[in-house]
């Protein structure tokens, strides 16, 4: 399937046919993949994406790297060090081959997805934090004198 223009990424990631997500490791995409419980193949380009990649692959163990090494100041531009097709193939096979490491990565990704789901439910940590923020903003608004 080819989608032109904006794609409903959250809906796509939630589809049961999705086995992995090739991501540039932007924070929004990372959070969406984690929330969906989908393991990631990481390909950072610039800014904080290389740090996010380390969080995904080394700290949390919910993805594999393609081996991008060259950081770019302006994002998508010509590179001196290209990621070759053999590196991409290796990352895809590592995650999709059904071996023990792939199963463990998938298990951890699904575990994080369940945790993320609980966090946004009523009473969950994200729900509580957002509710506290709203309450603080209301108190701040109500404490200001009317002009």
Model-assigned labels for residue ranges:
Residues 1-147:
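Catalytic core of nucleotide-sugar-dependent glycosyltransferases
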């Amino acid at each position: 399937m080819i989608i032109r223009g904006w794609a409903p990424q959250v809906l796509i990631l939630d589809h049961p046919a999705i086995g992995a997500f090739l991501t540039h490791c932007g924070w929004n995409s990372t959070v969406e993949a984690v929330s969906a419980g989908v393991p990631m193949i990481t390909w950072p380009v610039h800014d904080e994406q290389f740090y996010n990649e380390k969080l995904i692959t080394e700290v949390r163990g919910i993805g594999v790297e393609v081996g991008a090494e060259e950081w770019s100041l302006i994002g998508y531009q010509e590179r001196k060090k290209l990621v070759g097709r053999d590196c991409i193939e290796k990352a895809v096979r590592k995650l999709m081959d059904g071996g023990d490491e792939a199963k463990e990565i998938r298990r951890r990704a699904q575990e994080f997805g369940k945790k993320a789901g609980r966090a946004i439910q009523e009473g969950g940590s994200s729900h509580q934090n957002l509710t506290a923020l709203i309450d603080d903003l209301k108190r701040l608004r109500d404490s200001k004198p009317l002009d």
